[in-house]
Amino acid sequence: QQQISEMGSNMIMIHPGADMRGGVRQDPSAMQTLKLADYEALRDETNFLSAISPNVSSSGQLIAGNNNYPASVNGVGTEYLDIRQLTVENGEMFTEADIQSSAKVCVIGKTIVDNLFPDGSDPVGKIIRFSKIPLRVVGVLKSKGYNSMGQDQDAVVLAPYTTVMKRLLAVTYLQGVFASALTEDMTDYATEEITEILRRNHKLKASDDDDFTIRTQQELSTMLNSTTDLMTTLLACIAGISLVVGGI
């Protein structure tokens, strides 16, 4: 439950592809149904969102001088910080102008700083390389540490989504869209509105299934609670069987 709350208040996640097709769950990274035009339509037309950001990522090695570290560069918009409850502690977030120009800039987390700049030097203004592309560090995120599942939330690199799409991946589609509803009570209204806009954009007929998947923070919490309840029941059953087998 704590991990879900750490992801950001009222968060809504939109992924390409149907949740299930022919009884088989699809790999979202292989789907290309979400385009920049979808993000722009949602940004301009929705009434129940406080923030929205595209998401596209590329994995590889980060290099600074003689130091390197495996990481993913996440291409996002400026509102991603609000959605994920992140704060720039040193320097600044990249700008809309950087997004428009596909600027080779990035914002990094503390784990990246510690591994690429172990001498303690200020990374802001320095160049790191990813897939032979130089990225100038413009900001460092405030540390969030590890989440309740033991995942390092500081091993993060953010760059303009246009930079990742054009310079790193050479793709025209998105791997996802993150958004925040204005309030928790408005989440359902927001998802309905998102569904209507995307179905219209994708020219889907009434009989067509959605070619995208929407998940809300509330849904994730419910799923996690259900899984926890199931595991609790399962463990209780196993314990009971053990007692019977042991003759207790």
What are these regions (language model features)?
Residues I238, G247-I248:
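Membrane-embedded alpha-helices of multi-pass transport/permease systems
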Residues Q61, G125-R129, T213:
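Residue-level detector of beta-strand face positions
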Residues M13, S50-S53, G139, F178, ...:
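Residues embedded in well-ordered beta-strands within globular domains across many folds
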Residues Q1-S72, V76-D82, D114-N115, M165-K166, ...:
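Hydrophobic, regular-secondary-structure patches
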Residues D19-S29, R199-D211:
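Short, flexible, glycine-rich and Lys/Arg-enriched loop motifs at helix boundaries
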Residues D38-A41, F48, I112, P160-T163, ...:
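Hydrophobic alpha-helical segments typical of transmembrane helices
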Residues N74, E79-F94, D98, A103-S207:
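Mid-to-C-terminal secondary-structure elements
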Residues Q1, I194, K205-I241:
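Peri-transmembrane interface segments
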